[in-house]
């Protein structure tokens, strides 16, 4: 049976992890969300989230966006290539409802899958 947990090793935790992705990223984006990715050698994907206060003013909205993004990653982690991902929320993402945001994230995960040609 496939585990759908979200343990610590599936997260980008340090600034060095984020810098690694920002150096040579493959990107996929919508007007509201961008996902940068870079291949890693760990054998499993990892994710980091950036939701700027400048783009999403209210803390509960930032938390909602992060919660939905983590859940989307958790459900798709076994179908994703072994990459480090950084999810960047842009202006207007707080206006999306949960269903629309989840669909946008699923579309971007599929796009990264096609770009890496390992899915």
UniProtKB/Swiss-Prot annotation:
Alphabetical GO biological process terms: tRNA 5'-leader removal
GN (gene name): rnpA
Q: Which Pfam families match?
A: Ribonuclease_P (PF00825)
Q: Does the keyword Signal feature in the UniProt annotation?
A: no
- Role played: RNaseP catalyzes the removal of the 5'-leader sequence from pre-tRNA to produce the mature 5'-terminus. It can also cleave other RNA substrates such as 4.5S RNA. The protein component plays an auxiliary but essential role in vivo by binding to the 5'-leader sequence and broadening the substrate specificity of the ribozyme.
Output one GO MF annotation: tRNA binding
Q: Which organism is it from?
A: Sodalis glossinidius (strain morsitans)
Q: Please give the catalytic activity noted in the UniProt record.
A: Endonucleolytic cleavage of RNA, removing 5'-extranucleotides from tRNA precursor
Report the HAMAP family cross-referenced here.
Answer: RNase_P
How it assembles, according to the record, is: Consists of a catalytic RNA component (M1 or rnpB) and a protein subunit.
Report the GO terms under cellular component.
ribonuclease P complex
EC top class, in one word? hydrolase
Q: Indicate the family of this protein.
A: Belongs to the RnpA family.
Kindly give the InterPro entries that the UniProt entry links to this protein: Ribosomal_Su5_D2-typ_SF, Ribsml_uS5_D2-typ_fold_subgr, RNase_P, RNase_P_CS
Name of the featured protein: Ribonuclease P protein component
């Amino acid at each position: 049976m496939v585990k759908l947990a979200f343990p610590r090793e599936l997260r980008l935790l340090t600034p060095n992890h984020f810098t690694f992705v920002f150096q040579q990223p493959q990107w996929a984006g919508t007007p509201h969300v961008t996902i940068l990715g870079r291949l890693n050698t760990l054998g499993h994907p990892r994710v980091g989230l950036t939701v700027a206060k400048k783009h999403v003013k209210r803390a509960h909205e930032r938390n909602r966006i992060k919660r939905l993004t983590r859940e989307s990653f958790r459900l798709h982690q076994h179908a994703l290539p072994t990459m480090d991902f950084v999810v960047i929320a842009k202006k207007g993402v707080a206006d999306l409802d949960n269903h629309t945001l989840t669909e946008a994230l699923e579309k971007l995960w599929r796009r990264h899958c096609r770009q890496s040609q390992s899915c």
